[in-house]
Every structure is written in C-alpha cells, then in structure tokens.
Amino acid sequence: MIVLSKEDHAALHAPPKQLPIEAVMDGPIEVWDDETPLPDDEVLVPFLKEVELAAGSGRTSIEINTKRRLRFGKYTLRNQGVEPCNARCVVIYGNSMEPVLRNGATVGVDVGNTRIIDGDLYAITHGGQLRVKQAYRLPGGGIRLRSFNRDEHPDEEYTPDEVVAQEIEIIGRVFWGAMFF
C-alpha cells in the first residue's frame, strides 16, 4: 500500500496547470483576407487543380487555380530550397497516403525539382489525374509509385514505354504538408 501526504494527494488530483498564453504565442495573431496587402517577405502560392476537358470524355488536365492561394514566407521557401516562383499547393484526395497525409491534406510542391530521389514524395500527373506518391526510379528508366496505405493501394510499376503511354509526369517534389485532424 502506498501512503500519500495530503499535499501529494492534492497535487496528484489537481487539474493540470494552464500555461500563460505568452508561453505558447510569440506576438499577436494577425488576421488577413484577400484585401490585406502582402508583406514584402511573403508570397501567395497558387493551388493546382484538375479540370475536366470538354465533351465529357472523363479526361482531365492540371491547371493553376487562380482563386485559391496560400501565404508562405519567402525565407521559409528558400530554407527548403524552393524558389518562390516554383511553389505550388496541392490538396490530397482519397486515403492512399494515409496515415501520413489524410484526405483533404494540403502539400507544398516545388515544380522546379522534378529529379526523383528514391522514396521522396512527388506531385504527379497520370493521364491528367493529379496524384501525390512516393516515387522510385527503376532500372532502364521505369518508375515505381508507392502509397503509404499499401494495404489498399499496392505499388505501381511502369516501364519507360508505359510512362509515356499513360502520360505519367513528375510535377514536382513535395516540400511541405499540413492537415486537420
């Protein structure tokens, strides 16, 4: 049997102490909207989106969404090796990248970096479909695309001829991600 003093018992059952707001915030929260001027040290990064082509063919193309943008600090981008003019954002749809990137997560993509480093994440266009996958180079110029949710989404391997025929292209390397829980 363990015997506690009244002070230890009270401390054990006391509600957790709240940190003062100053302990977790460094300065005020700035609220901004589309009318707020952009500071010199920030850029607005556009989102990419799939657009269905005419005549209901089911085919899509990837375009810049001119209405949706996300603010990034220029220093933050350059610290990741990304030139601000090469930054884009992409929304993840589906469960193929769970548990790392959930449905609805947003990732930052460097369109100036398309050289595959095995295992890194890339935004890819696959026959006009926008996808985010781990990519691996295969001997002879092929490519392996991997999902984190491999139980439901097994690896996909493509020969160089299949890469061309299925219109698989690397859009850019993922450098940042965020999601809500």
Predicted segments with their positions:
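Short, positionally conserved secondary-structure boundary motifs
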Residues: 1-103, 164, 177-181
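Acidic/glycine-rich C-terminal interaction modules and beta/coil loop segments
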Residues: 78-181
